[in-house]
């Protein structure tokens, strides 16, 4: 996969302020505030920055954490997991493999079959419904 590279200024022109803060500056939207937290529409969730397909709605579940949660990415190659030691915690950050957008974090407390919970900011996603 070819990486999509832009300067921070280019991203700032392309994204709204909240998208820029979360996707490029590694911010986090408030829990239960994102538009996809409770959505059950069948489709594919794409990266808001580069339109790369990231998650399938069939792997989405209600974790109760306030952010959309998935037990697996669409393809393992769609995301990259990075050790995150910010805020006095050790976590695993999830970024888009194509454009390095910060998406959220993955935790080992999800349902079968993976036991993982990809906790993703709604503002980083664009849901494309299946026809």
From Swiss-Prot:
Active site: 119 (nucleophile)
Family according to the record: Belongs to the MsrB Met sulfoxide reductase family.
GO biological process: protein repair; response to oxidative stress
Catalysed reactions listed for this entry: L-methionyl-[protein] + [thioredoxin]-disulfide + H2O = L-methionyl-(R)-S-oxide-[protein] + [thioredoxin]-dithiol
Keyword Ribonucleoprotein: no
GO molecular function: peptide-methionine (R)-S-oxide reductase activity; zinc ion binding
Protein name, as recorded: Peptide methionine sulfoxide reductase MsrB
Cofactor(s) named in the record: Zn(2+)
Classification via PANTHER family: METHIONINE SULFOXIDE REDUCTASE, METHIONINE-R-SULFOXIDE REDUCTASE B1
The keyword Zinc is assigned to this record: yes
Class of enzymatic activity (EC top level): oxidoreductase
Annotated MsrB domain residues: 8-130
NCBIfam families: peptide-methionine (R)-S-oxide reductase MsrB
One cellular component (GO) term of this entry: cytoplasm
Keywords: Metal-binding, Oxidoreductase, Zinc
Cofactor: binding details: Binds 1 zinc ion per subunit. The zinc ion is important for the structural integrity of the protein.
InterPro entries documented for this protein: Met_Sox_Rdtase_MsrB (IPR028427), Met_Sox_Rdtase_MsrB_dom (IPR002579), Mss4-like_sf (IPR011057)
EC number, UniProt record: 1.8.4.12
Residues that, per the record, bind Zn(2+): 47, 50, 96, 99
Name of encoding gene: msrB
Listed Gene3D superfamilies: Peptide methionine sulfoxide reductase
